């Protein structure tokens, strides 16, 4: 589907883009890949990695700027929306800015994609959008609903929108694994943990890319795709990084949950299970009963929840140590 196509990635200099771009170039050989982002230094650094590859282009711009988006989307077939304000405390202390990027930016992109006749758009979401308690999660919930509704908003146009929902991305820049590793390397003492009960979903960047590929292949429009991924206990992660270190329990930060949720009870009425993922179908227009969207899925039980503490798949301390050892060179780099 993506072979010989033109693909634009918003926020393409982030962790996702650094993995999605080379993997997609290798697997699909697209005609053109455009990285759309607002940080010129990150673009300059990323461009060095793709020097000489005429398929890769860079476009300075902000999702808040609809006119610039419209220009960037010229001759584009597919869009991945990865741009976001995503650090929870940053969003809490800068709420207006978070709304401008995560909500207004989504609206701008939806409008521009429809106007430009883009074929398919996949937006990246987060487990924090399910029953959100922080501003970041709330803005991503609104964003998810905007992209789902975009299929109706498009009217007679052919543009289709879907969403993929992730857990914590293992080893990405600013995530907990490089944070713990930096404390260990500096010998700064105890590893801070907000709550000893805390659990999190974990997904690799490669799994995230594959879920986007699957969404492009499978989508009819309006679906939210949720990858089946393992959970881990944060205390186990700390022990896997620094087995001898003391753990300091510092209390939950504003906007944090003890356990994360990917699919809530209220979504269970419209959720179908597949071997490697779940699919939440939109309630609007009776699309949740659409055979072309359900395909070979099995309806989950009403009241089903997919949370990081009730997950049947877990990463042990040994599993985490093995992953860290195998990915030592790239942890925190992208």
What positions do the PLM features span?
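Strand-loop microenvironment adjacent to phosphate/nucleotide-handling motifs in alpha/beta enzyme folds
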Residues: 1-5, 115, 145, 149-334
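N-terminal Rossmann NAD(P)H-binding glycine-rich loop of SDR-like oxidoreductase domains
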Residues: 6-26
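Rossmann-fold scaffold of SDR-type NAD(P)-dependent oxidoreductases
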Residues: 10, 73-82, 123
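Conserved S-adenosyl-L-methionine
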Residues: 23-32, 117
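Conserved glycine-rich Rossmann-like NAD(P)H-binding loop of the short-chain dehydrogenase/reductase
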Residues: 29-42
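Conserved residues in the N-terminal Rossmann fold of short-chain dehydrogenase/reductase
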Residues: 37, 59-60, 100, 249
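Conserved Rossmann-fold cofactor-binding substructure of NAD(P)-dependent oxidoreductases
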Residues: 57-78
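Conserved Rossmann-fold NAD(P)-dependent oxidoreductase catalytic core, especially the SDR/UDP-sugar
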Residues: 81, 85-141, 145, 149
